[in-house]
Amino acid sequence: MSLSIGLLSYRSHPYSGGQGIYVKHLSRALVQLGHKVDIISGPPYPELSQGVNLIKIPSLNIFEEEDRLRSFKKSYFISPLDLFEWLSVMSGGFPEPYTFGVRVREYLKKSLSNYDIIHDNQSLCYSLLDLQKEIPLVTTIHHPITRDHKLELESTNNWKQ
């Protein structure tokens, strides 16, 4: 039986961090087994094998900015979610799982019927919990994301970063 799988990853760097590499190899194996796979990811986006579709969920991607303080744009005032994401990062928070969850839920409201199952790869966002009422939801937890956040904070040279 062939399945249509939505594989979620809030951040999928293609060369480091693990999530982008994990979803690349998992999606390739699932396609080889005959399944249809969409990677639904926030930036940075993964490099994927042939036959795997990428659905890009935009975000501010502030963690990639050299000067996060100066990355602010007036347009953030238009979107409460963008403003929350920027303010949270600037105060030492790690909002990406939450903000990805809100954004991906909006995408899935329109596209849920395209999938037989959703596989959440580490995003652990609250907004996905109600999906279980409508579609099977599987979650993979690799390790606590608080470890990533702690390492990020420890590696900064000054408060601007």
Model regions: which residues?
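Short, basic, glycine/proline-bearing loop/turn elements
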Residues: 12-13, 90-93, 147
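A conserved catalytic-core segment of Leloir-type glycosyltransferases
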Residues: 2, 40-103, 108
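Short, hinge-like loop/turn segments at secondary-structure boundaries
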Residues: 53-58, 136-137, 155-158
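N-terminal subdomain of nucleotide-sugar transferases
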Residues: 1-61, 111-113
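Short N-terminal targeting/anchoring amphipathic segment
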Residues: 92-96, 107-126
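Nucleotide-sugar donor phosphate/pyrophosphate-binding loop at the beta->alpha transition
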Residues: 96-103, 147-161
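Active-site proximal beta-strand in glycosyltransferases
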Residues: 5, 117-119, 131-151
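Short catalytic/ligand-binding loop motif for oxyanion handling, primarily in non-cytosolic enzymes
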Residues: 16, 46-49, 64, 125-130, ...
